[in-house]
Curated annotation (Swiss-Prot):
CDD domains: ATPS. This is Sulfate adenylyltransferase. The gene is sat. Signal peptide: none annotated. The keyword ATP-binding applies.
């Protein structure tokens, strides 16, 4: 059986990353263009456009696509897209740009020239409306809402040419992969059904259990970690990479799973982000996305299984990648092993509730981590990381993390 098709009507990957002489010529031309500075989130989105992770998009969205994505998860041409992919700038710069003008796209943090874009549209948006639709809140305490509210006043829409993947290929060599690379690896392994496990945390026993359930169902699993920016207090990607490698080496059958990484920042959009995670995993060649408790959530903004329910609300043909919906999982002392609400008849006093937030809080505060919470090889790496921190960030517990 072949792998799932890339997303979109054409069913082919559309990487927008230039190479060779064309790249050199376009980079030279871009030196004389007006510069639009990119936020970290926008740079990650541009790189995903470059590697084909956001197939079939050809650039940053114009107004009709923004509106359709925000309100109906649907672009103007009927393509399913659950979160808008947009570029913003100041009104001051926007007023100087003409329709049809080409601009250079520069990462604001590093100053690196990342690409170019033809400005086909300039438009203003109701940011609070976008936040209420996508995040289900306009509270700026929500990190994703804060990102949107801090955007420039004007959105620019148009096709892009991508020049660089930033530091990801060198900084995360062997983990950072393009959709073409993951697809080639799956085919080399003889996999046709592949489940993606989304993670922004080091893997504890519940994560391990979810992946092993998926291995029983599918040919293999892509442990696909986010390599872009997170919120304060989250554990950086290099530490996660080492801890995931330790887990795979000691507790998984060789050849059943692969660790990969992708260049996006977290949006913390909960159910909507779960849909985006499934969409771009389809481009990476994954037939399934593991969706556990509070997928892509933050705080108490979403119910623990809202991300399960949203897949039942979209058109059946919206995505080829399907969710593997897995119930609340935990360690049960009476069962003497990992279990879920579907498999364990015992009460909460017999269960050890596991969460990444709880693990980070215990490690940050120097508390002893209970047996069965995480593997010792993983804890060793995490304890070393926390011991080296000069400044601790308070980790706030929320309802789902406490197992309530």
């Amino acid at each position: 059986m072949p792998l799932v098709n890339p997303h979109g009507k054409d069913k082919v990957l559309k990487p927008l990353l230039l190479s060779g002489e064309e790249l050199q010529n376009e980079m030279e031309k871009a030196k004389s263009l007006k510069e639009v500075r990119l936020s970290s989130r926008e740079t990650g989105d541009l790189i995903m456009l470059g590697i084909g992770g956001f197939t079939p998009l050809e650039g940053f969205m114009g107004y009709d696509d923004w509106k359709g994505s925000v309100e109906n998860c649907m672009m103007a041409d009927g393509t399913f897209w659950p979160i808008p992919i947009t570029l913003s700038t100041s009104k001051e710069l926007g007023d100087t740009l003409g329709i049809g003008e080409e601009v250079a796209l520069v990462d604001d943090e590093s100053g690196e020239l990342m690409g170019s874009m033809v400005v086909e549209e300039k438009y203003e948006i109701d940011k609070a409306h976008e936040c209420r639709e996508v995040f289900k809140t306009d509270n700026i305490e929500h990190p994703g809402v804060l990102q949107v509210m801090q955007q420039g006043e004007v959105n620019l829409g148009g096709p892009v040419k991508v020049f660089s993947e930033g530091s990801f290929p060198s900084e995360f060599a062997g983990v950072y992969m393009t959709p073409a690379e993951t697809r080639a690896l799956f085919e080399k392994n003889g996999w046709s059904t592949v489940a993606a496990f989304q993670t922004r945390n080091p893997m504890h026993r519940s994560h391990e259990y979810l992946v092993k359930i998926a291995i029983e169902i599918c040919d293999g699993v892509l442990i696909h970690q986010l390599l872009g920016k997170l919120k304060p207090g989250d554990i950086p990607a290099d530490v996660r990479k080492d801890s995931i490698n330790a887990l795979m080496e000691n507790y998984f059958v060789k050849g059943t799973c692969i660790q990969g990484g992708y260049p996006l920042d977290m949006r913390y959009a909960g159910p909507r982000e779960a849909l985006l995670h499934a969409l771009f995993r389809q481009n990476f060649g994954c037939s399934h996305l593991i969706v556990g408790r509070d997928h892509a959530g933050v705080g108490d903004y979403y119910g623990p299984f809202d991300a399960h329910h949203i897949f039942d609300e979209i058109p059946r043909d919206a995505l080829e990648t399907k969710p593997l919906k897995i119930d609340w999982t935990f360690y049960c002392y009476k069962c003497d092993g990992m279990a879920s609400m579907k498999t364990c008849p015992h009460g909460k006093d017999d269960r050890l509730s596991l969460s990444g937030t709880k693990l980070r809080k215990m490690l940050s505060e120097g508390e002893e981590v209970p047996d069965h919470f995480s593997r010792p090889e993983v804890l060793e790496i995490l304890k070393k990381y926390y011991a080296g921190l000069e400044e601790k960030v308070e980790v706030k517990m929320h309802t789902h993390a406490e197992g309530k």
